């Protein structure tokens, strides 16, 4: 553009980044294949510090395609570039160099842990053909109004999932894996459940989150609150009572009310309705415990935590009418508007922030 002067080195760097952005679909699709081929789990099982060659990997994965090692090498190179894998050279007997690949901390979270949980299903759901189609409608949604997913399917993502058993399975698996990993970290980091006699998990689904809380704090009575058809199919958990209802109508009473990743699916008006019902369900000096992502006040941050949350905000923009990630000030404003006397940001667990709204 006229008037914009850059040095040759700045131009070089900027153009290289532009090309990387232009081909940025490569990384998620390579990761999708790596997960579907069980590459990451196989490398993780080898253990930290143990390296595998592409040929080793093809053999362990029982691949019959004679070209598989060469193709795997190209996939592994991409993953190593983004620190999903580590790599080192190994000199062969003929003097040629072969590259070997190993586990990294990022690979740890994209592989099954001791609980069988992983972030991998979260990646698979976002690369699934169903939600991918919605991105082709984002431009129209911005120009004409509405939500990209609704334009693609005529309904929101939650209603669609209830009508598509295969996608529903993929969706639920992604939520379960992410939730298990995050809740485990929350329970290691946050001590605000100590001393509670009862806790209500609003929008608690099958009760898995509440079961994790009660397993650590067995004297707490847990109330898992969700829509009747959701809790009707939920498994029995010791110390957990399933209660069906509508959070927009009322919320069961408890010492504390827990809401994890609920508010980012709703508009400010809907969040306020939910919070006012929570306020009515609490005695004085009791609290709502909120677990949500917090988006920075100032745009332009380049750290991984910021990139992660702005990605999730874009996901909510495309998939969920009214859904969005919020700043700390926006959460505090919601708490104040609902009548709570204090707001406190307590701690962070894998980019999910714990906040307390006290009555």
From Swiss-Prot:
Gene3D superfamilies: Vaccinia Virus protein VP39 (3.40.50.150), Winged helix-like DNA-binding domain superfamily/Winged helix DNA-binding domain (1.10.10.10). Its EC number is 2.1.1.69. The record marks 126 as: Determines the catalytic selectivity of hydroxyl groups in esculetin. Its main location: cytoplasm. GO terms for cellular component: cytoplasm. One of its GO terms (molecular function) is S-adenosylmethionine-dependent methyltransferase activity. The keyword tRNA processing does not apply. Changing residue 320 to I: Strongly increased catalytic activity. Increased catalytic activity. Abolished catalytic activity. InterPro entries: COMT-like, O_MeTrfase_dom, Plant_O-MeTrfase_dimerisation, SAM-dependent_MTases_sf, WH-like_DNA-bd_sf, WH_DNA-bd_sf. Changing residue 157 to Y: Increased catalytic activity. Slightly increased catalytic activity. Strongly reduced catalytic activity. Changing residue 319 to R: Abolished catalytic activity. One of its GO terms (biological process) is coumarin biosynthetic process. Changing residue 157 to F: Increased catalytic activity. Changing residue 122 to R: Abolished catalytic activity. CDD domains: AdoMet_MTases. Bergaptol binds at residues 126, 264. Mostly expressed in roots and, to a lower extent, in stems and leaves. Changing residue 312 to A: Altered substrate binding. Pathway: Aromatic compound metabolism; Secondary metabolite biosynthesis. O-methyltransferase involved in the biosynthesis of furocoumarins natural products such as bergapten, a photosensitizer used for medical purpose such as treating psoriasis and vitiligo or facilitating resistance to microbial infection and other stresses. Catalyzes specifically the methylation of bergaptol. Not active on xanthotol, isoscopoletin, scopoletin and esculetin. This is Bergaptol O-methyltransferase. It comes from Kitagawia praeruptora (Peucedanum praeruptorum). The gene is BMT.
């Amino acid at each position: 553009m006229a008037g914009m002067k850059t040095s040759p080195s700045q131009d070089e760097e900027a153009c290289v980044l532009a090309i990387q952005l232009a081909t940025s679909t490569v990384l998620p699709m390579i990761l999708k294949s790596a997960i579907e081929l069980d590459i990451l789990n196989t490398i993780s099982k080898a253990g930290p510090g143990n390296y595998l060659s592409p040929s080793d990997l093809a053999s362990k994965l029982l691949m019959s395609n004679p070209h598989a090692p060469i193709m795997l090498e190209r996939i592994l190179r991409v993953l190593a570039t983004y620190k999903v894998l580590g790599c080192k050279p190994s000199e062969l007997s003929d003097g040629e160099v072969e590259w070997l690949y190993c586990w990294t901390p990022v690979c740890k979270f994209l592989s099954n842990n001791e609980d069988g949980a992983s972030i991998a299903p979260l990646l698979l759901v976002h690369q699934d053909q169903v939600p991918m189609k919605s991105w082709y409608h984002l431009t129209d949604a911005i120009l004409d109004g509405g939500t990209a997913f609704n334009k693609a399917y005529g309904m929101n993502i939650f209603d669609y999932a209830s009508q598509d058993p295969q996608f529903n399975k993929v969706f639920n698996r992604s939520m379960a894996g992410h939730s298990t990993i995050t809740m485990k970290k929350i329970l290691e980091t946050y001590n605000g459940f100590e001393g509670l006699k009862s806790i209500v998990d609003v929008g608690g689904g099958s009760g898995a989150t509440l079961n994790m809380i009660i397993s650590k704090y067995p004297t707490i009575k847990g109330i898992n609150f969700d829509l009747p058809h959701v809790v009707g199919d939920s498994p029995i958990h010791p110390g957990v009572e399933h209660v069906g209802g509508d959070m927009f109508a009322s919320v069961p009473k408890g010492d504390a009310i827990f809401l994890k990743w609920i508010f980012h699916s709703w508009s400010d008006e809907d969040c306020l309705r939910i919070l006012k019902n929570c306020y009515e369900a609490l005695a004085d000096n009791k609290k709502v415990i909120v677990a949500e992502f917090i988006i920075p006040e100032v745009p332009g941050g380049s750290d991984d935590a910021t990139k992660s949350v702005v990605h999730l905000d874009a996901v909510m923009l495309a998939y969920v009418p009214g859904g969005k990630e919020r700043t700390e000030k926006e959460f505090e404003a919601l708490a104040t508007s609902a009548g709570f006397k204090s707001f406190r940001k307590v701690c962070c667990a894998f980019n999910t922030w714990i906040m307390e709204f006290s009555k």
